[in-house]
Amino acid sequence: MLVPNEERTLLAALALWRVGFEQFHGYKLASQLRTMHTTTRAMSYSTLYRCLDRLSERGLVHEVPPNPTSQTRGPKRREFMLTTEGETKAVDLAKAAGEDSELFWNLA
């Protein structure tokens, strides 16, 4: 069973995947969470990455190995992608919540 923050994170990952973002990093996911959940308190990056780690342990997301040539400055970005199981779980969550409106799939 997922906790609410894990559900929100998984739903945001699904929304990104549906518009073509097969891989995503924390900043993009946090931006999507803010777009989708304007009435709830923003999730901190540390909470977001803990959720991603737990979702990864459950096989719902997969951390993509870093590409050493893709980023030359700053801290290394951790990239993730939905697994097939994660996609299925997120779609089930969205249906259960009645999240079939255009607002749910809206991107910033």
Give the location of each predicted region.
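Accessory beta->alpha helical hairpin/"wing" motif in late/C-terminal subdomains of nucleic-acid enzymes
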Residues: P66-P68, F80-E87
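Short coil/loop residues immediately preceding or within conserved phosphate-binding loops
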Residues: R77
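Short alpha-helical segments that sit at the start of domains
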Residues: M1-F24
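Basic amphipathic alpha-helical segments that dock to polyanions
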Residues: L48-R58
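Beta-hairpin "wing" of winged helix-turn-helix
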Residues: R58-G74
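Amphipathic alpha-helical dimerization/coiled-coil segments
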Residues: E85-A108
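DNA-recognition alpha helix
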Residues: H25-T39
